[in-house]
Each structure stands twice: as structure tokens, then as C-alpha cells.
Amino acid sequence: MAHQAHAYHMVDPSPWPLTGAIGALFLTSGLAIWFHFQSVTLLTLGLILLLLTMYQWWRDIIREGTFQGHHTPPVQKGLRYGMILFITSEVFFFLGFFWAFYHSSLAPTPELGGCWPPTGITPLDPFEVPLLNTAVLLASGVTVTWAHHSLMEGARKQAIQALALTIILGVYFTALQAMEYYEAPFTIADGVYGSTFFVATGFHGLHVIIGSSFLAVCLLRQIQYHFTSEHHFGFEAAAWYWHFVDVVWLFLYVSIYWWGS
């Protein structure tokens, strides 16, 4: 490796952004094909390609940051700014869904019966599964903070336990959400109520799955002694992301489940 007289990481050429983009294209196109033609071939191909890309890209970043020492303090600072900007872009992404929901619900058109929820829609009880989901997600926010503090204090076993607990709570939330979708008395095709409900809560559910995988990678890395109390940006980024998912759910619960019902 050539000697460099600066603290910045000159990233080597990598195929993963391209394979990741192709995987995402196949996944979204496959989803549309599955909805309309009941064929899961392209969807499965996209999912496999995306999972392989994730595995190999994560592997490369772990090699560069943990074993080759490329993640110097200035590089970590850049990664922090990058994560903050990414979460900010996600805030605006969800803002669009809330805008659609409030636009439709605050001034319901005569076609909807002039009321909200629209005529013929039976909304879900906000004090049943949605309230349990809120408790589960808030508890996972506590456990991820416990994991972070344990990591900073060098309490390795506690960090592993807290991380494992957070992932279990994330999986439990996803299972409850899937059950709620299965038993919902309305579908995504039931006008503006169905579409805003399922798109907003569905994208949030997708973010919970992404966050759970992010934390699962952190758990594996913590088990393999990759993190130290000073050097654990991968975990920090996962924790920020998880707290963001937490806060979005609180807004979804108050807006769509409680006020919207």
C-alpha cells in the first residue's frame, strides 16, 4: 500500500454501489410484478442480490475501518455528518406521508362522505395492538441506550445482552405489525385511508427491519471484539437510526392510529 501523508480515506474502487442499485431496481420492480401478476421471480432475485451486496459491502467496510485503520478521527467525523444528513433526508421522506394523511383527513372530500375515517372504513383500535407496539418500540429505545452506555463503559457482556434484547424487541414489533396487517378490516385498495395507512406504516415497518439488520451486524461485531469504548461509530450510527425509527412511530401512532381513528 502506498504511503499517504494525510488522515483521509481514499476509498478503493468498489462494485457494491452498482450491484446494490441493480438489486434495489429488481426488488422494487419485482414488488410491482408480484402485486399485479403474482410472480415472485424478480422479487426473489432482487432480494438475493441485495442481501449478497449488503454482506460483502459490510465485510469490506469492517476490514477498512477495524483491521486496516482507515477510520481515523477526521474520517469518522465525515461519516457522522453523512449519517446525520441521511437521517434528515429520511425525516423529509416521512414528512411526505404525513402531509398526504393530513391533507386528506383535515378536509375530507364529499366523495369520502365528508368525514374521517371515510364512510365504510372501520379503523383499528389504537389501544390494542398499536399501543403494545408503541410500548415494545419505546422499550427497545431504552435497551439500545443501555447497550451504548455499556459499550462506552467497557461492559462487554451487558452490551451484548442489551443489543440482543433490542433485536428481539425489533423482531417482535415486526411480527405484531404483520399480524395487524393480516387482520386489518381494510386493505391498501380502500381509498385514501387504506393507501395512506399502509404506505406510511409499511415504510416504517421496512425501516424497523433495516434497523434490526443494522443492529444484528453490530451484535456480531461486538461478539467478535470489533468495538472499543472509543471506536464504535458503526454502533453509534445504528443507535441513531433506531431512535429515529422510534420517534417516527410515535408520530404515526398519535396521527394515524389515535387522532385518525
Swiss-Prot record:
Q: Which family does it belong to?
A: Belongs to the cytochrome c oxidase subunit 3 family.
What does the record give as the reaction this protein catalyses?
4 Fe(II)-[cytochrome c] + O2 + 8 H(+)(in) = 4 Fe(III)-[cytochrome c] + 2 H2O + 4 H(+)(out)
Residue ranges of the TM segments: 16-34, 41-66, 73-105, 129-152, 156-183, 191-223, 233-256
Where found in the cell?
Mitochondrion inner membrane
Q: Which SUPFAM superfamilies match?
A: Cytochrome c oxidase subunit III-like (SSF81452)
Question: Looking at the record's lineage, which domain of life comes first?
Answer: Eukaryota
Q: Which UniProt keywords apply?
A: Membrane, Mitochondrion, Mitochondrion inner membrane, Translocase, Transmembrane, Transmembrane helix
- The UniProt record lists the EC number as 7.1.1.9
Main location class? mitochondrion
- Provide an example Pfam family for this protein: COX3
Q: Which GO terms describe its biological process?
A: mitochondrial electron transport, cytochrome c to oxygen
Spell out the subunit comment.
Component of the cytochrome c oxidase (complex IV, CIV), a multisubunit enzyme composed of 14 subunits. The complex is composed of a catalytic core of 3 subunits MT-CO1, MT-CO2 and MT-CO3, encoded in the mitochondrial DNA, and 11 supernumerary subunits COX4I, COX5A, COX5B, COX6A, COX6B, COX6C, COX7A, COX7B, COX7C, COX8 and NDUFA4, which are encoded in the nuclear genome.
The UniProt entry lists membrane topology as: Multi-pass membrane protein
Q: Which InterPro entries match?
A: Cyt_c/ubiquinol_Oxase_su3, Cyt_c_oxase_su3_dom, Cyt_c_oxidase-like_su3, Cyt_c_oxidase_su3-like_sf, Cyt_c_oxidase_su3_a-hlx
Q: One MF term from GO for this chain?
A: cytochrome-c oxidase activity
Q: What does this protein do?
A: Component of the cytochrome c oxidase, the last enzyme in the mitochondrial electron transport chain which drives oxidative phosphorylation. The respiratory chain contains 3 multisubunit complexes succinate dehydrogenase (complex II, CII), ubiquinol-cytochrome c oxidoreductase (cytochrome b-c1 complex, complex III, CIII) and cytochrome c oxidase (complex IV, CIV), that cooperate to transfer electrons derived from NADH and succinate to molecular oxygen, creating an electrochemical gradient over the inner membrane that drives transmembrane transport and the ATP synthase.
Residues exposed to the Mitochondrial matrix side: 1-15, 67-72, 153-155, 224-232
Instruction: Please provide, in alphabetical order, the Gene Ontology terms of the cellular component aspect for this entry.
Output: mitochondrial inner membrane; respiratory chain complex IV
Write down what this protein is called. Answer: Cytochrome c oxidase subunit 3
The stretches that face the Mitochondrial intermembrane side, renumbered to this chain, are 35-40, 106-128, 184-190, 257-261
User: Which CDD domains has this protein been placed in?
Assistant: Cyt_c_Oxidase_III
Q: Does the keyword Transmembrane apply?
A: yes
